[in-house]
Amino acid sequence: MATTRRAEATWSGDLIGGNGKVTAATTRVFADLPTTWKARTEEADGVTSPEELLAAAHASCFSMAISNNLAKAGTPPTRVSVAVEVTADKTDSGWTVQRAHITVSGVVPGATQESFQEAAEGAKDGCPISKAIKGNVELS
């Protein structure tokens, strides 16, 4: 069964001096998050960016995928924590998301370091957000 989620953004002004707002239109769990070009390319200063939202989506997705993999291996986690750092940089073709670095830790009774690593590798390959960016962005 397919699911569809919707987000909306508005932008006012030009790229450099303008500003925007992002809303989770399906759930409204967040609304009118401010965003600016400066938040994307310099300091965030309390303002989000598409790259930060991508990192949040990836971290959330990855945490679900690794939890599922660990449970399927017979070692359901008590807790997993996932941090994703998305790096964008200016290239000859313009600004590009270049990599997503994933850091994972957890409390997983009965799991070995090897089985945890195997579950993480499976999550890297199986998480739908990882799949969406794989081939375009370096995943580590």
Regions of interest found by a model, annotated:
Residues 1-56, 63-140:
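Extended beta-strand/beta-hairpin segments
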